[in-house]
Amino acid sequence: MDFSIKGCDWSKGEAKGFLTGKSDCIVLGIFEAQTLSGAALDIDTATKGLISRVIKAGDMDGKRGKTLFLHEVSGIGASRVLLVGLGKQDAFNQKAYNDAVTAAWRALLATKVVQVTFTLAQLPVDERSSDWGVRAAILALRNETYRFTQMKSKPEPASHTLKRVVFSVDPSDEKAAKVAVKQAVALANGMDLTRDLGNLPGNVCTPTYLGNTAKKIAKDWGLKAEVLGLKQIQALKMGSFLSVARASVEPPQFIVLHYQGAAAKAAPVVLVGKGITFDTGGISLKPGEGMDEMKYDMCGAGSVLGTMRAVAEMGLKINVVAIVPTCENMPGGNATKPGDIVTSMKGLTIEVLNTDAEGRLILCDALTYAERFKPAAVIDVATLTGACVIALGGHNSGLFSTDDALAGELLDASREANDPAWRMPLDDEYQDQLKSNFADLANIGGRPAGAVTAACFLSRFTESYPWAHLDIAGTAWKGGAAKGATGRPVPLLAQFLIDRAGQ
């Protein structure tokens, strides 16, 4: 799909090219107050009051998400006009904008339009410029057009015909909007990779498959990939990671992916992604109902790989290292048992009270490994706890950090990227719940504050660098009729790196 940018100040009579240019449809926003302004006012004038008459007749009330097509409109070059309800003008915020653009894309994709002129990006949204609106609109469109068909014997072809979108933006935002197009396409491509990896079944997306995916990203985008096997992991003394992997016939992999966009001496940001490609719970076996969704337990790894692809496509001037410990968590005669004690790469001993709290066991060794890069910051991403889903639901990812400045950067990025996160507590008092009579610490801290104690466990392995943890158990995938991976938190991570790179 092709996206282009055209500057236009509708209030200054600069709309002639839009009014006369050939297009299958021009998209206009209407507030509930039904007062026309900007593009809608110019189009109304050019069509001799058609939009005003439609509103007066009651066919478009401006309620959020409502759409109405006007066909064979005279006075303009577009063969159709799509009116999109924006809701109340004084309540028009990021969510209202996203609702409006999503409604517009759904309406357009149900038709046979090929080329569209899109004016909604110029709407005032929380004092954001139109380049932000362009990026959000492209991501919304790519979200609507994403389909996972790789495992179908006869994949259905795309039903829409849309091929080209021309965005009208404020002239002062034209240059930034062109950058936004590039970033949005790269982000969408990274999110699609993340979704594809999550949606693949566990018998396809194995640890070896993730390792090969990292190698392909490296080959396609000029990165450096290292994929360590069992013997190399053993040599590193990653006893905690290996305690999870030991009962599976699938060999574990430890993936390290390097992107160098800045000077070699510049400290990298390290992203660590949990890569449990299927989680049965091990000896602490999960209930059978819904266990199929445990193929999504590698979505932390998928989001890190998707972010690396997006960063490479954007060409960010920053150094980034991705680390992915990946294995299956299976029961078996040689599986780790509740009560077993294992030794981490750091040397700390861990009493494994529950083998279904395995994500932290593979992440802790990866976080120790990250020290060798002398990182500027480390962010781990994991579908870590059901407790985080109970606390935050499916809207916000849980953010934990021992560094207030880093947490602030991530929260700012989450708002800019429309990929919400909520900071959770990480007080020292919670550490007491991880005490063990027999080892340095236990891998669980009981039912109270389960998401917090999981993050507290990880914090024991992050004392030498600024660190944050994103628990995406509630946001990485959806269940029900819309079942599938979401691609989150690729937008948040990518925006954080864009901000760090100053781009």
From Swiss-Prot:
The lineage of its organism: Bacteria, Pseudomonadati, Pseudomonadota, Betaproteobacteria, Burkholderiales. The active site is at K286, R360. Gene3D superfamilies: Leucine Aminopeptidase, subunit E, domain 1, Zn peptidases. Its main location: cytoplasm. Belongs to the peptidase M17 family. It is found in: Cytoplasm. NCBIfam families: PRK00913.1-2, PRK00913.1-4, PRK00913.2-4, PRK00913.3-5. CDD domains: Peptidase_M17. One of its GO terms (cellular component) is cytoplasm. Presumably involved in the processing and regular turnover of intracellular proteins. Catalyzes the removal of unsubstituted N-terminal amino acids from various peptides. This is Probable cytosol aminopeptidase. One of its GO terms (biological process) is proteolysis. The gene is pepA. Binds 2 manganese ions per subunit. Its EC number is 3.4.11.1, 3.4.11.10.
